[in-house]
Structures are given as C-alpha cells and as structure tokens.
Amino acid sequence: MQAEEQFSCGVIVVAAGRGERAGQSSEGPKQYRTVGDRPVITHTLDVFATWDGTGPVVVVIHPEDEELFASARKRMGHMLDLTVVHGGATRQLSVLAGLQAIAGAGVKHVMIHDAVRPFFDHALLDRCRAALRNGAGAVLPAVAVADTLKRAQAGGLVAETVPRTDLHAAQTPQCFRLEAILSAHRQAAASGQADFTDDASIAEWAGIPVHLVEGSPDNFKLTLRRDLSMADEKLTRMAIPDVRTGNGYDVHQLVEGDGVTLCGVFIPHDRKLSGHSDADVALHALTDALLATCGAGDIGDHFPPSDPRWKGAPSHIFLEHAARIVRERGGTITHADISLIAEAPKVGPHRQQMRESLSAMLAIAIDRCSVKATTNEKLGFVGRNEGIAAIATATVVYASGGDA
C-alpha cells in the first residue's frame, strides 16, 4: 500500500450546472458568482491547490462558460495545473465526462466535488484519504441529520414524521477507486439510469459498499440566493483577522541574595527578587498579557500566592499554562514583547538568551520575541534599586468566529 505522503487522488470538480434556483445574475451561474471578493469556484479550487494529496485535477464546465472560467481562474489564490472538459446535459453525464478525462492520468483513486461547496477543508480531505488507504472502494462524507423530518402530502399537510435515526446528509467530495466508479457510471449510462443525484448513489446501485466518514457542518452547498449571501458574509468574516493585544505589568522587590531570574534566565547579582514563586517579574507580566487576550483573568486567578503548591515554583509553569489556554481557545501567539525597568543587573549581555528562552516556552520563532531594558533614571523605587518592574505586550490572532 502507498505511504500516506505518496497517496494522491485525482480530483474532479463539477462546475457545469446552470444554478437556476440561485436566480439569474450578470455574473453567470452560481459557481462564478462573487463571494468574499472572488468567484465561488476559485475558493473551491484553492483548497485542492494547497492540499498535499491532490493529484491530477479535471474541472467540468458548461460549453458556454469557457470565458467565465478563464476569467475566474485568474482570480485563484494559488497555482493549480488542471484540465478543463465540457459537461453533459445532467450532472451525471458531466461527472462521466470528468471520469473519462482523468482515466488516463495514472491515478487509482478519485475525489468528485461540487464546485459550489467552497467551505470544505484539508481535515475533511484527510479523513476521506484515510478511508481510501484503509481499503474502502467508496467514501462518502456526511453529517447526521439533526432536524426533525416531515413527509408532506397534497394540500401542504404533514403526512408523517420520518425517523431520523441513522439518517445522514450527503456531502462532497465523494471518493472512489477510479476504475470502479468509472465502470459504474458507464453501466448506468448504458442501462438508461439517469436519475441519480450523486455519485455515491451510483456506487450503491452498482453494488459498491459506501463507507461513511465525518463530514463538516460548514461544507454546505450553495443552492439558493440566500446561500450565496451567507457565503459572502462568512468569507468576509474569515478575511478579517481577529487580532488581539494584551498588556501585563508586574513588579517585585529586590532583597539580599545571589541573583535574579528574568525570562527564565538566571543572572548572578548581589540581590534577588522577592516573591512567592521564583519572582520572575518578566514572565509574570507576560503571563498576564497572554491571559488578557482572551479575557481569562490574571496570574493570581490561576496561581494564587496563598497556594503553597506555587512556593518557589519556576515561572515558566505560569507562562506555559497561559499559552495553553490561548491555544485551546483558538489563538495563535504571534509576538511577545517585554520591557524591563531596572538599575541593575545589566540585561544587555543576557538579552539573546532571554529571547531564546521565551521562544522555547511559547513555541514561536525567536524573531517574534523581544526583550528590552531601561533604567528609571534614578527616580522612584526602581531608581533607588529597591525593585524591578516589567511591562509585557502579547499579540495573538484568534480564529475568526471562535469563542474566546
């Protein structure tokens, strides 16, 4: 069996529909309508363009849409080699045209996807690929039906309630062994079977077991005009990054000792910082800054000084805890900045080691970690060498629409 990194799938993107239910538009069928500043089909193709399992790609379009597709292709965010073929009078015939075009491309598996489902992701593609690797001949992503279903009768009356147990809503991409689904499509065409609504139905008809994998609630099909409006709103929201900045401040008293710990780095000195933990004033300030980006309180809420467990504790525990909370809430730490205010010891000789320490604790690149130091010009308690203060700023990007 192929190794996962070598297991690629041919892709057929079905884009030959007319989309009457979405209403007429000067932009053409719904796959060419603009959502999030680009045609729908470009969002769909970009997902495949950035997935590591994408093999040969065939796009099936309507014969009248060549100019529309050529224009849309120029708007793609990523390069993608693809073949364009013309579809038939029905979706079923369009898919058959795509299968026949990809049959000589040297792939054993194929994914068939609706162009008007732009909100699938790599995780869904990975689940489909894993099922194919495990030997499935047909794979269907689907979501369990959550709504109560009613069967209607004449006059707009309810005839019965349909039990929803074991019912699933089918999605795409639907994935198959290429040889098997091509044969099934050819058999269906030869026998005059032309009323299948998806490719999994053809596989079922041909006796191919269809394996379910978890779909995605976001992977909805753009069918009606309101779907296009929802898609535009969703893509617009996704395009605006949720960037948050948190600030933190801390100060600790200097007492007789043999050194101070700043940013997790011990610096020999004739004094030390007094505190319940190791009194790393820099990490305490940065911990508060991270917690502030998601409204998670402050360091005292999570590690109260009255708790003996934290007596003498290394402060990297506090910072890593805050970073974990940020990530659990969908945040990506993009920058950390610390300003130390002290008369002594000199921070400059240790600055690079401090940045390396922060980089390791936060699991971010060192160029995203900044440490600066200044004196207080002999003014105040810092100027009298009675303590060290720290001001920290954390920048975090949260997943748009996520809870924080």
Swiss-Prot record:
Pfam families: IspD, YgbB
Keyword terms of this UniProt record: Isoprene biosynthesis, Lyase, Metal-binding, Multifunctional enzyme, Nucleotidyltransferase, Transferase
Annotated binding of a divalent metal cation, by residue: 250, 252, 284
Site positions (Positions MEP for the nucleophilic attack): 164, 221
Annotated spans, 2-C-methyl-D-erythritol 4-phosphate cytidylyltransferase: 1-243
The protein's required cofactors: a divalent metal cation
Pathway assigned to this chain's UniProt record: Isoprenoid biosynthesis; isopentenyl diphosphate biosynthesis via DXP pathway; isopentenyl diphosphate from 1-deoxy-D-xylulose 5-phosphate: step 2/6; Isoprenoid biosynthesis; isopentenyl diphosphate biosynthesis via DXP pathway; isopentenyl diphosphate from 1-deoxy-D-xylulose 5-phosphate: step 4/6
Signal peptide: none
UniProt xrefs under PROSITE patterns: ISPD, ISPF
Chain segments carrying region 2-C-methyl-D-erythritol 2,4-cyclodiphosphate synthase: 244-404
Known EC number: 2.7.7.60, 4.6.1.12
BP GO annotations: isopentenyl diphosphate biosynthetic process, methylerythritol 4-phosphate pathway; terpenoid biosynthetic process
List of residues binding 4-CDP-2-C-methyl-D-erythritol 2-phosphate: 250-252, 276-277, 298-300, 374-377, 381, 384
Annotated site, Transition state stabilizer, chain positions: 21, 30, 276, 375
Organism domain of life: Bacteria
The reaction(s) this protein catalyses: 2-C-methyl-D-erythritol 4-phosphate + CTP + H(+) = 4-CDP-2-C-methyl-D-erythritol + diphosphate; 4-CDP-2-C-methyl-D-erythritol 2-phosphate = 2-C-methyl-D-erythritol 2,4-cyclic diphosphate + CMP
GO MF, one example: metal ion binding
InterPro entries: IspD, IspD/F, IspD/TarI, ISPD_synthase_CS, MECDP_synthase, MECDP_synthase_CS, MECDP_synthase_sf, Nucleotide-diphossugar_trans
Biological function: Bifunctional enzyme that catalyzes the formation of 4-diphosphocytidyl-2-C-methyl-D-erythritol from CTP and 2-C-methyl-D-erythritol 4-phosphate (MEP) (IspD), and catalyzes the conversion of 4-diphosphocytidyl-2-C-methyl-D-erythritol 2-phosphate (CDP-ME2P) to 2-C-methyl-D-erythritol 2,4-cyclodiphosphate (ME-CPP) with a corresponding release of cytidine 5-monophosphate (CMP) (IspF).
Family: In the N-terminal section; belongs to the IspD/TarI cytidylyltransferase family. IspD subfamily.
NCBIfam families assigned: ispD, ispF, PRK09382.1
The protein's name in its UniProt record: Bifunctional enzyme IspD/IspF
Origin species: Sinorhizobium medicae (strain WSM419) (Ensifer medicae)
Source taxonomy: Bacteria, Pseudomonadati, Pseudomonadota, Alphaproteobacteria, Hyphomicrobiales
Encoding gene (name): ispDF
